Amino acid sequence: MAGVSFSGHRLELLAAYEEVIREESAADWALYTYEDGSDDLKLAASGEGGLQELSGHFENQKVMYGFCSVKDSQAALPKYVLINWVGEDVPDARKCACASHVAKVAEFFQGVDVIVNASSVEDIDAGAIGQRLSNGLARLSSPVLHRLRLREDENAEPVGTTYQKTDAAVEMKRINREQFWEQAKKEEELRKEEERKKALDARLRFEQERMEQERQEQEERERRYREREQQIEEHRRKQQSLEAEEAKRRLKEQSIFGDQRDEEEESQMKKSESEVEEAAAIIAQRPDNPREFFRQQERVASASGGSCDAPAPAPFNHRPGRPYCPFIKASDSGPSSSSSSSSSPPRTPFPYITCHRTPNLSSSLPCSHLDSHRRMAPTPIPTRSPSDSSTASTPIAEQIERALDEVTSSQPPPPPPPPPPTQEAQETTPSLDEELSKEAKVTAAPEVWAGCAAEPPQAQEPPLLQSSPLEDSMCTESPEQAALAAPAEPAASVTSVADVHAADTIETTTATTDTTIANNVTPAAASLIDLWPGNGEEASTLQAEPRVPTPPSGAEASLAEVPLLNEAAQEPLPPVGEGCANLLNFDELPEPPATFCDPEEEVGETLAASQVLTMPSALEEVDQVLEQELEPEPHLLTNGETTQKEGTQASEGYFSQSQEEEFAQSEEPCAKVPPPVFYNKPPEIDITCWDADPVPEEEEGFEGGD
């Protein structure tokens, strides 16, 4: 709400006011009112008639202010009265708005003693206004009021006050004190401001120091991190260098160890080769061949067996010299077809030799060639796979076998005309006499060895039937066994023995082909049959097993005329001739020597003993390899069912088919070839040993020394 305004008509208001308060002026009142529609105060009228004249100028529709000077007889100075006129017709809102303007108007007009509020002329009473002006100063006109005033004055107590007389010194002290405190207050404010500044500076300095410390710590951490990374990198490089050195060292050690192993293997190989070469050289230089003794025994036995019958030439290209094994015991019953295809081969002392099939070498190279080449000087030994040798032989025996293989394979067969006898042939010539003397000693014991007879070269007939692997693995009986069982004439025995002597003589002296073994011979003065003890006194009867007779060759007989095993078993045995009486019964042979027993029980024996035991097997393996290289594998005919490869036999004794020498066949026809005889089922094996060791004393001493 806006207040009263004096600015619009300020000069007029003050001029009228001055006229009223001034003593020299005749005017004693002035009337003021609001300008239309505003709060600006203005002068309405003025005069000299006092309260009576002033009360006549008030209006009922306005709010007006009257300033009047009243003179009192009892007072020396006039009194000033301010009348607040509010007309009856003034709106209430205007009344409320102007109620607050009274104090400001009284303040504007200084010296107002009494303010009188009036809304009508009756409210403006000169006596009442004078009474109020004279209250406390003049005596009251009423006696009652006078008594009351006196009574109040008597009972009134003195009023206390703090007013004192002004003292200059005290006032100076007070002023100085105030100045001091003001100065102190200012100083305190300055101090506080300085403290705030100092605190702020300290805070800033602390923050800076903290930031600097953090920066230094960060740099220190980074420095430590870099140092740690450098250390780790150096350690990694050192580790890598150590690993590289370790790898180089291991590689060097491996290379050194590999070189050492290679040197050791090479030295071991050289040592083994030197031992084999030395053994082969010693074997080649010995005067007597221990195998020749058994060949002569086989020839004698075959010649004796041939004297009991007169067989025709065999229609098959069968290899002669297959001895009759004394360990075979055939059964008397059982069909041949079922047993030959279903039964398994028996266990033998030489399992590898049993199942290993070799071609017939006798059709291309004679026995004399092999023996003469074997007596020649040895050559370097080529390496062979371990599978080519027998599983029962020792490493030394395998090496000896390789040496003999190299000797026999590297020497070409000599030309047909006999060359002049050399020193070596002259040295080996006395070996026949020594062998004959040894034969005489051995025949004193109750032993008989199956011999071999020369076989004429015949054209190989193609196999009639294709053989199966099972039938190929079946073992057959040697033709010498059939020859011993078949009847023969005594006259043929003498001729066969003479042929054997002539073949031995040519074999040991000239080392050439034996094409004249069966033709260019002279009858011997004395038969080797007489060398056997008792001259037939200890001869035994033929074996109980039936033998298939030898089929005649050519047009005399055909393959269909060969009786089967069952049919042959029903025929009566022929009478034993005079030549057959000289043969011993193989069932009555003594036990074989312990050196040719089951090799599976001799694993723990010494090297020397194993070399002695496996020498025949190693030498025979050489012949088997030569047979495989020089001649295709012919087939034999079984009991009318399928063809069977030559090189299989039912069982092995000391002279198994795989272990025996492959005797060469002559190109000219020989006396006879006994047919093969087969069993209905695999025969039983009688593992026996001979009392006498067939190895010569010189060879035993040499191999025992190794």
Curated annotation (Swiss-Prot):
SUPFAM superfamilies xref list: Actin depolymerizing proteins
Biased amino acid composition, Low complexity: 331-345, 453-497
One GO BP: cell communication by chemical coupling
Function: Actin cytoskeleton-organizing protein that plays a role in the formation of cell projections. Required for actin polymerization at immunological synapses (IS) and for the recruitment of the chemokine receptor CXCR4 to IS. Plays a role in dendritic spine morphogenesis and organization, including the localization of the dopamine receptor DRD1 to the dendritic spines. Involved in memory-related synaptic plasticity in the hippocampus.
Polar residues composition bias: residue spans: 357-366, 382-396, 639-651
Protein name: Drebrin
CDD domains recorded: ADF_drebrin_like (cd11281)
Species whose genome carries this gene: Mus musculus
Cellular component terms (Gene Ontology): actin cytoskeleton; cell cortex; cell-cell junction; cytoplasm; dendrite; gap junction; glutamatergic synapse; growth cone
PROSITE patterns named in the record: ADF_H
Subcellular location: Cytoplasm; Cell projection, Dendrite; Cytoplasm, Cell cortex; Cell junction
Top-level taxon: Eukaryota
Pro residues: compositionally biased ranges: 411-422
InterPro entries recorded: ADF-H, ADF-H/Gelsolin-like_dom_sf
Residue ranges, compositional bias (Basic and acidic residues): 209-236, 288-298
Subunit organization: Interacts with RUFY3. Interacts with CXCR4; this interaction is enhanced by antigenic stimulation. Interacts (via ADF-H domain) with ZMYND8 (via N-terminus); the interaction leads to sequestering of ZMYND8 in the cytoplasm.
Disulfide bonds: none
Signal peptide coordinates: none
Residues recorded as bearing N-acetylalanine in the entry: A2
Tissue-wise expression: Expressed in the hippocampus, with expression in the pyramidal cells of CA1, CA2 and CA3 and in the granule cells of the dentate gyrus (at protein level). Highly expressed in brain, also present in stomach and to a lesser degree in kidney, colon, and urinary bladder. The E2 isoform is specifically expressed in adult stomach, kidney, and cultured cells.
Taxonomic lineage: Eukaryota, Metazoa, Chordata, Craniata, Vertebrata
Residue span(s) of domain ADF-H: 3-134
Gene3D superfamilies linked: Severin
